[in-house]
């Protein structure tokens, strides 16, 4: 009897430490036209209010489609590495300061409208995202197919059936979506039969000034001339902006993304910065199978890890059709713009898409690099103190005042081009069992001194 009672109490104790929520409890049904953004926002707020520290929490979505619009979404000021720093951002599923949370889509499709970050996860520990896909009803990339290519009259093309467009008053082809209009400057050409990038094409110009319709949904662009684009070629027309990744992670510890697929994002599929220990298993930036009529996925890299540490594991994934690399792992240098004294430097983020977020902490190990030659200068050092220099808080800062434990090498100054590299925020990487195909640019980039 005593053993039975003990087991009963143990099981009850385990059950008491796990809370399960179903999104249908909040009035959101799968496959309805209801805007999911405000409902999910309220559900997350309720979970945060009710759950105690140490409890495991699961938020489940019954399988089906859920539509997220900008209206009712979470609005945030986020500074995201290697993305446009245009704030504020609108977020469909904003997860912040969470512990032991699992979002289980159970095979659901999360479909977004407008210009949004589908999912953000910040300052969280031991969280799992699994079993869902991310897509947009109207991608900001316009897929068109070449139907005629006349050396004198230019290229005639047909937009894909889902592409909404207009010919502007100044005769330019423009893509349309919920709350946005896009003019396209460049494109990537795909073989219409194989979906391979057309050999030796790289980024192609697609000038549409002077465009006109020759028939419904058939457009002639007299100034667009390129003999390589034979009839049947599919072009993903795009701009250079990258405002919103599919999933944004920052300052998280021990995160798993399991069987999550990103079919489109107006940025990178996954951007993780200043995170520790990330596992991707069955993660994909990919099409919806062999019969998907689309040829493209994300506007930039499939996955990107900036200033992370611990171990990054990416396995059993599919990366295809993206407009940049499958994976890029790196840190961000600060340029030395002022030597204050023998222990203090002012460093600045120089990349227009990488600033505004934390760079280092007291106790972090650093080294100094001469930018012209990439030579290491002086000895490794350690941060004793760091604070934003150009504003009162880290958020939105470009410059930092950094005091080091040991004296700085006399050669390091603001005149000769020196960078500061944070060695603490560098990860070990395991990238295995993944498929990369049919994408612009490269495959894998690993810039870390740790084991890869």
Put a short name on every predicted segment:
Residues 1-10:
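Bacterial N-terminal signal peptides
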Residues 16-452:
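Extracellular/periplasmic carbohydrate-active domains that bind, remodel
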